[in-house]
Amino acid sequence: MEEFYGELPLYDIRESKIINLANLGTHHFFEHEMAVIDTHVVQRLKYISQLGPVYNVFPTARHTRFEHTLGVTITLNKMWNSLSENGSLSFLGTGSKPRKILSDLRMSAILHDIGHCPFSHAHMFQKSF
């Protein structure tokens, strides 16, 4: 694994984990996902608000980009499972191809917010006149 992740600074935890989110329940994250989740670049999302300054109006509206990232990954997995169960993914065939695609999608979900800085979406709520 070290050769794959190269020089990424990793925390000591590298095994797979079960993570419990209050609104989405308990979910499994694999070893390679935890190796990325435990990097500083993803862990810093714990300190960036997903909702920007909304908590000034709604004091309990506190949600971090880290929580959002885990939620997106879990929701993606639920969507994949639903599509798989109803046969919508049959065109992918069987074997390792669908597993590889799901793995890539999950990693994309984990990494999708790492480039955001605080309040980066705040401009989306401004009205243009």
Language-model-detected regions and their locations in the chain:
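Metal-dependent phosphohydrolase cores
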Residues: 1-129
